[in-house]
Each structure stands twice: as C-alpha cells, then as structure tokens.
Amino acid sequence: MLSRWTRRVNESRLAQRKLTLLGRAIALVVGELLFNAVCWIAAGICFGKTDGILGLALLAWTIGLRHGLDADHISAIDNATRQLVSQGQLPITCGLFFSLGHSTIVIVVNVAIAVSVDIYDKLDRVGSIGGIVGAAVSASFLFLIACLNIYFLVGAIKQRRSMKRRQALGLPPDEDEGDPSKIYGGGCMVRVVGPILRAVDRPWKMYPVGVLFGFGFDTASSIALLAISAIAQRGPNGDAISHGKIVILPFLFTAGMSLVDSLDSILMLYAYATPDSTSPEGKLALLQYPDPNYKDSYLEETVATTLPAEDGQTERHVIEPIDIPQGETEGLETEDNIKAKTGNEILVEEERVGGPSRVDGSGGVGNERVMKAKANTMSSLSIILTLLSILVALSISLIEIMGLIGDNCTQCQDAANDPDGGGLAGSWWRAWARANDQSGYIGAAIVGCFAAILAGWYGAKWGKKKWKARRDANAAIVLEDNEDDAAETPVA
C-alpha cells in the first residue's frame, strides 16, 4: 500500500516536470538535427543510385546554411527576440518560425515545378515583382523593429538611471516609472510602433514575417534550378528521375536554414535574457522539478486582508491565497528568495513591477517574468547588445533599400554599368550592389560580433570573480597571521 502510494506520488511529480531554458534549447537543436538526418536519409534512398543528384542535394543544403546567415535574417531574428524579451517572454523559437515561413515559398515553388516543369519559365516574371515586394517588406520590417527597440532602449536607460538615483537617495521606486515592455502616450511614434508591437507579440508570428521575406523568390529560384537539373538527370537504366522526388531538395534547404536560424535565436535569447543561476531556469539542468515546499512558503503570508489607506489613497487589498498547481510555477521566485510581504512592502513591489501583481487561476504570478525581463533589459550587456542590434538593423535596412533603388532605377543602372566607371554615381551604386551581394558574410560577421561580446563579457566576469576570491583569500590569510602574531606577543 505504501509503495503504491509512493509510486503514484513519484509519477505525479515526474509528470509535473518542465523543461528549463537549457532543456528547451537542447530539445530544439536535437529536433533540428533529427530533421536534417531524416532529410538526408530520404535523399540517400531516392538519389543514391543516380550519379550527380546527391551533389545537387548537398548544394541545396549548403545554400540553406548560407542563407540562414543572411544579414536580414540575423537582424530580424535578433530584433524580434529583443522585443519579445522586453515583454517578459523567452522566445526560443523565433528563428525556427521565421525560417519555416521563408522556406514555405521555396517548398511551394518546387512542388509546383514537380507538378509542371513549365512553372519554372514563369518564375522570372513573378520573381521580378516578388523581389521588389520582398525587399521592401524586409527593409520596412527591419526599420520599424529597429525604431521599436530604440523606444525600448531609451525607456530602459531612463528607468535604470531613475532607479539608481532613487536608490542612492534611499527612496522607494517611483510608481510612475513606465514599464519598458509597454508603450504609453499618444504621439506619432507610439501610433506607428504600437501596431507592430501588437502584431509580433508571439514567436509563431515570425512565420508570416518569414513568408513576406521569401517573396523575393531569389532562393526559390536557386532551388528550383537545382530541381530542374535533377529532373534532367537520368537513372542507371536511363530512366528519368521521378518529379515527386525533387521535393526533397527544398526540404534539405529548409533543414539547413532552420538549423542556422534556430542556433542564432538561441544565441540571441541567451544574450538578452540569461537566467539567474539561482533560478530554476538558470540551473545547468534539462528539467526543473516542482518544489513541494514552495506553495506554502509563498502563500502562508498572503492572508486575505485590507491594508490601511494612506492619505489621499483608496484602500488596497492583498492578494488572497489560491491554489497554484506545482507544475505551473515556472518563473516564480525560489523558496530562499521568498520573503513575507505585507503592507507597504507589497505596494513597493507592485510599483517596482509597474502595476499590481496578478495571480490567475492557471497558476503563476503574471508579472514575475516581466520583472525579470525588465532587470535583463536594463543590464549593461543587454543595453550594449540592443544598441548593436539597432545599428545593424538600420544598416541592413538602408542597404536593402539602396539596393532596391539601384536595381530598379534606369539612370542608376546606367551609371553602375558605365564602361568608363560612371564617375562618383557609378562608384556609389556599385558599392551598394556589392554590399547586397555580401549579405551572407555580413550576417556571419554579426553573429561573430555577438558571440565575441558574450564570450568577452562572461569571461571578464569569471576572471573578476576569481580575482576577488583570490584577493579575499589572501586578505584572510594576512589577517590570520596578524592575529597569531598578536597572540604570541607577550604583554608588557
């Protein structure tokens, strides 16, 4: 009887385990690798006996890897991740949904070619219009998302300065301080960026953004050309390749691009919202276990009562204790960090959050993750990375706009293609064209800069921690030696 009860308790506890941020990141990468493996196994089965087709499959996969490093991809994922983190989310799948949206266009085009090869002849006409639409959407999205992050950055810096100033004066946090995850006011800037914030407030909403980015049909045309080349190949018996098999090529492209974009999304998330090592999310573990003592430690002091009203204020009520399922306490404070909060302490905490705390029936404190996100977005590292991402987004947006103008302006084309160089105008437009052509290298450089900044930052923190520990140890030894010398000195 006892063993059965124990087994049920353990099974219930195991069922309530949740993946940590590290666990979700590893699960995402493992899923991507499995998808890549499945695509390659399918390619080997379909094309293994045909000379040259596996080479085309490898080319499609490497095109996906390289395209995942395009500067517009990196900048869009980076800025969208920063925006969602400022809203209290941990969006680990931004890159995945973006790449899936972009790949949808490639897959649809190649499926159409598998149905009718004549579709390829019409891609040029569609691609000329789609290229303009895709570049315009990409540049506009990057520009608007950069403006939105400028708003968040300015708000975070102002609030950080205000908090430090009030803390130095020994004053409580100002209840009028705005939450950087929200947009207040009614000015022109708010009217412009407000709909953008509401439009992309979940990671899955990066999927339609990726679809719009894919309207350029540049990668779709490249993979379609590989598909046409595969159809032209002959099998060992001289038979033509089945048209249905070429659909594997866009899936290989999708596998490569989604892998790179997912890794980029994970890197950006850890850059902006590295969890505290003392929290369940920040521990080096794949799963976080429910704390059986957590519920009582959190709720034992939240007795239903009414706080006395201060002068000029209405009565404020403390949150009544409700049953919070242990499996849904993700993002709450740990037991060691929980303190009894009554009276003015609760009011101060509410001011610090930017509004009254909210406990809903599904469990969890609604503003807890926003509080942590605010702390993350106001850190020095986050401010540096946000500034870098804004500059990158504005730069990539400018490059794409100038490239779009250069491709569709007759005078610009004449100056760029002038045999005599075209003077200053020719050099100007050729420079923008070269910048567009080097998008993959620019994207790789952006990722490298973020990785270098992260490595340098945490390396410096680790070195500083070790230096302080060594200094404190030496000071303790010197103090102990002085005490021993004082004890051995005879009293006159």
From Swiss-Prot:
Q: Which residues lie on this side of the membrane: Cytoplasmic?
A: 1-24, 72-94, 158-210, 261-382, 461-492
Instruction: Write down the membrane topology.
Output: Multi-pass membrane protein
Q: What subcellular compartments does it reside in?
A: Cell membrane
Q: What is its main location?
A: membrane
Membrane-crossing segments per the record: 25-45, 51-71, 95-115, 137-157, 211-231, 240-260, 383-403, 440-460
Residues on the membrane's Extracellular side span 46-50, 116-136, 232-239, 404-439
Single GO MF descriptor: nickel cation transmembrane transporter activity
Q: Which UniProt keywords apply?
A: Cell membrane, Glycoprotein, Ion transport, Membrane, Nickel, Nickel transport, Transmembrane, Transmembrane helix, Transport, Virulence
Assigned GO CC terms: plasma membrane
Q: What is the annotated role of this protein in its UniProt record?
A: High-affinity nickel-specific transporter responsible for nickel uptake and required for high levels of activity of urease URE1. Does not transport cobalt. Plays a role in host brain invasion.
**Name listed for the protein in its UniProt record:** High-affinity nickel transport protein
